[in-house]
């Protein structure tokens, strides 16, 4: 049986990538890849993108390139309303920024005992979230989710319970550990491969308190060819994690698995299909 079609959108510094996909008999089918160069702010660019390439009735997920602001913690079990109040209070305290106010979101799951729960609190710059949401809606898009960078990689490579993610963030490297779609620890380091390897150890050590298993592999994506080659020792140490299998048809042939914006959009499409949105 064929699912409804969805569209994942990734807004990078230089381009917007849209991927249209659906699921049939458990297989992800990628049918279209749309790329548009950026020239203005996020809201204007994404509005124009949807005016040209949007369509009525398709569910939209969006992610835009930004600094990773998240914290993972274990707390006593709380009801949903108390989780909401706690997450917003702690999120504002941890990620307080008077110049660029943040929007706070959270997710929770069972903790290491029946009395505890784990909570992931995430912050995104409120102005950018508003720009993107308004741009999509003004362009006629049916927006279902705005995700945080680089969370969609946990879906595009999400077959393992624990994995390292190494991505660029401005002139540094963001090293994060992901456990069943939750970012349990992250740290920002220089481009030096030895620092990155040490950071991989650090995020795992920080995550052991939550009973996160040893990483089953690593993702290195978003770097140029020279830097990717320099980081090969990371993959040799931890192993590689391939993208979730997909079937490509029609204009989906333009999909570039080495392009981080393409993969982010693909990961969002997988999330939308998994959520049934």
What kind of feature is each model-predicted range?
Residues 64-119:
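Internal amphipathic helical hairpin motif
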Residues 62, 102-104, 143-148:
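General beta-strand structural signal in soluble alpha/beta enzymes
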Residues 5-20, 25, 30, 114-217:
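Small-residue (GG/TT-enriched) beta-loop-alpha framework at ligand/catalytic clefts
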Residues 1-69:
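Early-domain small/polar-rich strand-loop-helix modules and first-structured segments
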Residues 55-70, 211-227, 246:
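Short glycine-rich phosphate-binding loop at a beta-alpha junction
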């Amino acid at each position: 049986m064929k699912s409804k079609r969805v569209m994942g959108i990734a807004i990078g510094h230089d381009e917007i990538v849209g991927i249209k996909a659906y699921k049939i008999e458990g297989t992800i089918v990628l049918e279209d890849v749309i790329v548009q160069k950026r020239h203005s702010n996020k809201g204007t660019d994404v509005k124009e993108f949807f005016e040209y390439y949007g369509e009525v009735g398709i569910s939209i997920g969006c992610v835009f390139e930004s600094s990773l602001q998240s914290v993972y913690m274990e707390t006593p079990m709380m009801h949903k309303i108390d989780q909401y109040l706690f997450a917003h209070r702690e999120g504002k305290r941890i990620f307080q920024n008077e110049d660029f106010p943040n929007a706070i979101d959270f997710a929770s799951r069972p903790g290491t005992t029946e009395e505890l729960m784990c909570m992931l609190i995430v912050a995104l710059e409120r102005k950018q979230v508003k720009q993107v949401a308004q741009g999509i809606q003004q362009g006629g898009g049916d927006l279902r989710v705005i995700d945080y960078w680089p969370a969609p990689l946990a879906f595009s490579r999400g077959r393992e319970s624990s994995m390292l993610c190494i991505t660029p963030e401005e002139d540094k490297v963001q090293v994060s550990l992901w456990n069943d779609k939750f970012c349990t620890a992250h740290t920002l380091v220089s481009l030096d491969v030895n620092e990155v390897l040490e950071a991989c150890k650090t995020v795992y050590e920080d995550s052991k308190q939550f009973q996160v298993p040893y990483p089953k592999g690593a993702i290195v994506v978003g770097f140029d060819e020279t830097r990717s080659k320099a980081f090969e020792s990371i993959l040799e140490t931890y192993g590689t994690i391939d993208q979730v299998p997909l079937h490509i048809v029609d204009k989906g042939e333009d999909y570039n698995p080495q392009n981080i914006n393409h993969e982010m959009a693909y990961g969002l499409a997988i999330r939308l299909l998994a959520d049934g949105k």
